[in-house]
Amino acid sequence: MNQAVWLPKLYPNKQWSNTLSQDRETITENEIVDGKFKKMNLIKGPVLDRIVFAHYKNIFGQTVYKFYGVYRTDIGASNKSGQHIHRRISKKINLSSYI
């Protein structure tokens, strides 16, 4: 299995600006250096699919984790935009594969 678990922050912070599209199908990842977006390095591949448990702050200010699905990096869109673009390929994961 070529997968990794990713726990991105989906709220503003000093190191990363990760945004989830309204339909939850795309995560856009930007690194922040000295308060500015840094152009991300080109991706040459192969890349691991990401099992995403994003953390975000709920209405009480608590950090919570939520499963969003399995995402695959869109190398073409990422290299073109200078951001890392991840597209959802599955809303489910079969945990029996990991036992």
Question: What are the roles of these predicted feature ranges?
Answer:
Residues 1-64:
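Acidic, glycine-rich low-complexity segments with interspersed aromatic residues
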